[in-house]
């Protein structure tokens, strides 16, 4: 099995080393094609107005000056043009990709691109807490991912479906279980604009985040609830975002 690994945190991110280790538990034919620089939050963007720069940094290791989407296309259609990958793994992201995160996430987008290209794909993310800070417990993802991937691959991923896996911010021995979940929803009040001033007094801005009022009470069965309960969350996501129920209403009313 040929595996293509990518991420959005960049070619030198610790999580990329973890996902390569996970991939090597499944196969000895593992290739890494990741962004030259951090691409967190770029979503499913595609580079069209600038050239892509490709740099080989080691055996089967390549850096692309582009997005995770660019990396998956470059990996599958150019670097591995002789024999396409059988599996795409994107991650392991530093931080969770739950609920609305999946819309912004370059990690999830890398897996979505793999799915669009007809390749079974997973996005993997490791939550971290205030206690762990800059030191996510990578061993949790490292411990649980191989067995989850093997089982899902054995079952078979439906066409046009990507599997989003999130690992809780706790040691492997403290994980409460593995749950199949649905995409959750947050109170979007967590987004804010942080205004500051530079040395000349000119304003500049950061998009910031703050805890929402309902952050501690996620809906039962959601990815948010699973992670809050120290469980691994496995969420199948579909490429087809059609709202079938509303489409039926529109069909009846727009005649």
Curated annotation (Swiss-Prot):
One of its GO terms (molecular function) is 3'-nucleotidase activity. Its cofactor is a divalent metal cation. InterPro entries: SurE, SurE-like_Pase/nucleotidase, SurE-like_sf. It holds the Pfam family SurE. It comes from the Bacteria. It catalyses: a ribonucleoside 5'-phosphate + H2O = a ribonucleoside + phosphate. PANTHER family: 5'-NUCLEOTIDASE SURE, 5'_3'-NUCLEOTIDASE SURE. NCBIfam families: PRK00346.1-4, surE. Nucleotidase that shows phosphatase activity on nucleoside 5'-monophosphates. This is 5'-nucleotidase SurE. It comes from Nitrobacter winogradskyi (strain ATCC 25391 / DSM 10237 / CIP 104748 / NCIMB 11846 / Nb-255).
